């Protein structure tokens, strides 16, 4: 069993912890929090040993009825690998600790590529991970882009990508962020950071991205245009998506035309935390013009799509499963991830 420490038990960390616990070849040996919070109570309910950075705060946790297993360094020493799910920028500060302890670690998309030196996506570059001490799972938006670009590049070749990210303003529980009544260019200059982030995994892809933030919390929405190298049809493209375990199709017959309706659908499916781990490509939007111009809309659940990637990254870094498709199958099966549509 791979012993996994989750350093940072927040939006991503709590999901990765549950995903690790569901795997047949992994176990959660601890999670970390900096202060008493709702997530700390969830960790207690899940039975995850809770570690804190500052043992001076231990009385506050104990007063709240939450047992502290020790400090974060003790958790790290007991682990085979660390998933660093701390806020953006904190992972960079944590890296020297992992280096000192000789631990493999996975960072999230909030960190720069240079923090790990290797950015990861299970379908695109799984086999390149094994000889690295560190890896970075690209951001939620970049994960969604890499999945769909890589799938079409493998099938038809991709000459060029132009994509617009319509980004949610905040996560549902993040009451400190906005906007409440505005559309904010993010940034006003072109490109946004998403294209260069995609290039850390798919360096050969010509991609330009634009982004804006809107007053919603449920998901991001992408408007994507690709120039393909080979002529194809809409039907052939849909077959590629149907055969991809992490690209779901929002069928026209579902009547879903918004992120809110899609979230309701995942809730009705009984998905944990209403998570959409896969891309949600709107079938009705999938178009091929003049044989080589591809268009679509896709929804990306910012809290969830990187979760299975973290699980595969654990196996890839540890070298325990050599075949990417086998790891992906194991991860999906344990999570109950059957792509919608």
UniProtKB/Swiss-Prot annotation:
GO terms for molecular function, please? Answer: 4-hydroxy-tetrahydrodipicolinate reductase; glyceraldehyde-3-phosphate dehydrogenase (NAD+) (phosphorylating) activity; glyceraldehyde-3-phosphate dehydrogenase (NADP+) (phosphorylating) activity; NAD binding; NADP binding
Where is it mainly found? cytoplasm
| One example of a Gene Ontology biological process annotation | lysine biosynthetic process via diaminopimelate
Give the top-level enzyme category: oxidoreductase
Q: Where are the transmembrane segments?
A: none
Catalytic activity entry? D-glyceraldehyde 3-phosphate + phosphate + NADP(+) = (2R)-3-phospho-glyceroyl phosphate + NADPH + H(+); D-glyceraldehyde 3-phosphate + phosphate + NAD(+) = (2R)-3-phospho-glyceroyl phosphate + NADH + H(+)
Q: Keyword annotations for this protein?
A: Cytoplasm, Glycolysis, NAD, NADP, Oxidoreductase
Record's keyword annotation contains NADP: yes
Q: Which InterPro entries match?
A: DapB_N, GlycerAld/Erythrose_P_DH, GlycerAld_3-P_DH_cat, GlycerAld_3-P_DH_NAD(P)-bd, Glyceraldehyde-3-P_DH_2_arc, NAD(P)-bd_dom_sf
**Protein location:** Cytoplasm
Q: Which CDD domains match?
A: GAPDH_II_C, GAPDH_II_N
**EC number annotated for this UniProt entry:** 1.2.1.59
Which GO CC annotations does the UniProt entry carry?
cytoplasm
What the entry lists under Pfam families is as follows: DapB_N, Gp_dh_C
The pathway where this protein functions is: Carbohydrate degradation; glycolysis; pyruvate from D-glyceraldehyde 3-phosphate: step 1/5
Superkingdom assignment? Archaea
State where NAD(+) binds.
11-12, 110, 168, 302
The entry describes its oligomerization and partners as: Homotetramer.
The entry sums up its family as follows:
Belongs to the glyceraldehyde-3-phosphate dehydrogenase family.
NCBIfam families assigned to the protein according to its UniProt record, in alphabetical order = GAPDH-II_archae, PRK04207.1
What name goes with this protein?
Answer: Glyceraldehyde-3-phosphate dehydrogenase
What is the species listed in this Swiss-Prot or TrEMBL entry? Methanoculleus marisnigri (strain ATCC 35101 / DSM 1498 / JR1)
**Classification of source organism:** Archaea, Methanobacteriati, Methanobacteriota, Stenosarchaea group, Methanomicrobia
Q: Which gene encodes it?
A: gap
């Amino acid at each position: 069993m791979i012993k996994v420490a989750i350093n940072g038990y927040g939006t991503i960390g709590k999901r990765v912890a549950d995903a690790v616990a569901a795997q047949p070849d992994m176990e959660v040996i601890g999670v970390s929090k900096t202060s008493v919070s709702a997530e700390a109570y969830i960790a207690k309910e899940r039975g995850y040993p809770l570690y804190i950075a500052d043992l001076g705060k231990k009385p506050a946790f104990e007063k709240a009825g939450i047992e502290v297993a020790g400090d974060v360094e003790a958790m790290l020493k007991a682990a085979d690998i660390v998933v660093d799910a701390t806020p953006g920028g904190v992972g960079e500060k944590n890296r020297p600790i992992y280096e000192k302890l000789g631990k493999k670690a996975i960072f999230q998309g909030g960190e720069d590529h240079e923090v790990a030196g290797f950015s990861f996506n299970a379908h695109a570059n799984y086999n390149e991970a094994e000889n690295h001490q560190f890896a970075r799972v690209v951001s939620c938006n970049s994960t969604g882009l890499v999945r769909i670009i890589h799938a079409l590049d493998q099938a038809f070749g991709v000459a060029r990508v132009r994509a617009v990210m319509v980004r949610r303003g905040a996560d549902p529980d993040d009451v400190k962020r906005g906007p409440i009544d505005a559309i904010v260019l993010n940034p006003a200059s072109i490109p946004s950071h998403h294209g260069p982030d995609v290039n850390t995994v798919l360096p050969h892809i010509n991609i330009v991205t634009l982004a804006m933030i809107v007053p919603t919390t449920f998901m991001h929405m992408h408007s994507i245009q690709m120039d393909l190298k080979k002529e194809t049809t809409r039907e052939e493209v849909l077959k590629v998506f149907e055969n991809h375990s992490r690209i779901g199709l929002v069928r026209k017959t579902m009547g879903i035309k918004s992120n809110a309706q899609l979230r309701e659908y995942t809730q009705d499916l009984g998905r944990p935390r209403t998570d959409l781990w896969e891309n949600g490509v709107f079938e009705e939007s999938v178009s091929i013009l003049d044989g080589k111009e591809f268009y679509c809309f896709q929804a990306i659940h910012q809290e969830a799509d990187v979760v299975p990637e973290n699980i595969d990254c654990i196996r890839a870094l540890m070298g325990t499963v050599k075949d990417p498709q086998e790891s992906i199958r194991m991860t999906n099966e344990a999570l109950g991830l059957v792509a919608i549509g």
